[in-house]
Amino acid sequence: NSSGEDDLILVLDVEASTSHSVARISDGEVFLRQNDKSVRLSREQILALEYDKGQRVFEDELAEDSSMEDIDHDVLDRYKEILGTNASDEQVLRSRRFMRNGKLTVAGALLFAQDPSAMLPQARVRVLRYDGVKMKTGEHLNITKERSFHGPLPKVIQDAYTLISSMLREFQFLGPDGKFQTVPEYPEFAWFEGLVNAVTHRDYAFRGDYVRVSMFDDRLEIVSPGALPNIVTIDNMRTTRYSRNPRIARTLSEFGWVRELNEGVQRIYTEMQNSLLNDPVYSEPGKVKVQLTLENNIVARTIRRSEALEDQASPEVISSLSEYELAAVRLAFANGKV
């Protein structure tokens, strides 16, 4: 130091609490430490904190104004077949903790109600296709296709899968054997697992937003409302198991949709690598949502296609074609037919 003496440095190592409970002071108030300040939380913020810590589980809350009349019996009948039971609808819902006191729980409504969005407006999936690589608004709005899906989660997942599959492109290139080979824009497992994870693990207590799938020319983005749950981080999500909505996750697993979160994420990486595409990118914009971005490498694929075309036609022939003739030849070459 300035006196020429050694400084004494104290290092305080405070381990994170293993308790998942929210501590209240004598008057019932709850404070949250943010940087160097203690901030008093509102009732809504306290509930959100309790959900995040797992002290309360939003999917187990009751969906007000719900009843057996809201049930989609086709979906519930499928579930009863999976369980191999002949019990009544109400018995099944009660025994699996999807109904209490004649009302559906949030999980019960999301999984089995005809229209969960009537009780939970945030419960929907929206799929959008954009022309280009950026989202534009106003007079430059570039949405070419848009559809929202409401209904019980098993139906939403199936219907969204069908639409997205129909909107994805295929790429063709000339293989080393001289034959055309077709590859999908993205490996199916990667985008579908991303969709299922978003629907399953999103924060349904987070109101005002919904699961969103945005398709651009060069990438596909899947946004799930709410930050990552509890102990999961961007860095450890490939190895950490945790479910914010365990009842929903278990039931969708019984329907054949859901894997363990870390197992599915790890395979998304593997599938993208096997398709010679960039690794998936996970991010938490504003710490209020989780975004998965899959890049389709369209530029490199276009270059490879052009190079393959040039291998089949001389530069003189290509240069002699008009702009429209060249576009027609490229289209026929890409599709493998005229």
Map each language-model feature to its residues.
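Glycine-rich phosphate-binding loop
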Residues: 189, 241-274
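Active-site helix-to-loop segments that bind/position phosphate- or nucleotide-bearing substrates
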Residues: 33-207, 215-218, 226-241, 264, ...
